[in-house]
Regions:
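Structural motif
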Residues: 71-93
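Periplasmic-binding protein-like
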Residues: 92-103, 122-126, 165-166
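Flexible loop/hinge segments that line or gate small-molecule binding clefts
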Residues: 106-145, 163
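Hydrophobic alpha-helical
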Residues: 89-92, 98-117, 183
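Short, surface-exposed alpha-helical segments at coil->helix boundaries
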Residues: 49-60, 81, 85, 110, ...
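An alpha-beta-alpha
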Residues: 150-190
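Hydrophobic membrane-insertion alpha-helices, especially the h-region
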Residues: 9-24
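Short beta-strand segments enriched in small/hydrophobic residues
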Residues: 25-55, 65, 72, 136-137, ...
Length: 191
């Protein structure tokens, strides 16, 4: 748990920064009184998952501080891409100023995101992204570097005869792909 606390705090700070940036982007005049409407669609809402609980809490705190309206729409499982896309479609129909989105797939949401952009809805990717660069802003960890650092550390603990299994969370999500890439780079010729 200790190793995750730093990551969770960092993500919460990044979420607050994202809302601050959005407040500035969406505010055409310094005297604007209209509240910014935001919808956040994380990969999952699960009170037993410290990471997503912290991300959602950080978004809520930042929205409150900057007097923005925030609605959270989340699927029941991280790998439930179909449900996440249904929620994205619902969010687009509500026409918020911005959609904050943590895609569970690198390519299955692109058409919906294009539709949102066509309707003038700003898009912020949080934690992961899609293949097409449809976002106005991305708030994420450098997952290749994080994986590389872990691979370099693991390399110190193993020898050439060691066998390593890489087990990922959700297949095809950008965070998993990048972390594995970095881990393999960090292992070097041990990979």
């Amino acid at each position: 748990m200790k190793s995750h606390k730093k990551e969770i705090i960092t993500v919460a700070i990044l979420m607050a920064a994202a809302v601050v940036i959005f407040a500035g982007i969406l505010k055409p005049e310094a005297t604007q009184t209209k509240k910014c409407s935001l919808i956040y669609i994380p990969k999952i809402r699960d009170n037993t998952n410290d990471f997503w609980t912290s991300v959602i809490s950080g978004c809520k705190m930042a929205a409150e501080e900057y007097e923005s309206d925030l609605e959270i729409l989340a699927p029941d499982k991280e790998e439930n891409i179909e449900e996440q896309n249904k929620l994205l479609k619902k969010a687009i129909e509500q026409k918020p100023d911005a959609i904050l989105f943590s895609p569970s797939s690198m390519d299955s949401s692109d058409e919906l995101l294009k539709e949102a952009k066509e309707k003038g809805i700003r898009i912020t990717y949080i934690d992961s992204y899609t293949k097409e660069e449809l976002q106005d802003l991305t708030v994420a960890t450098d997952n290749v570097n994080a994986g590389r650092m872990l691979g370099e550390y693991a390399r110190k603990l193993i020898d050439k005869d060691s066998k390593i299994a890489i087990v990922s969370h959700v297949k095809g999500v950008s965070t998993a792909v990048e972390r594995e890439q970095g881990f393999r780079e960090g292992l070097g010729d041990y990979a």
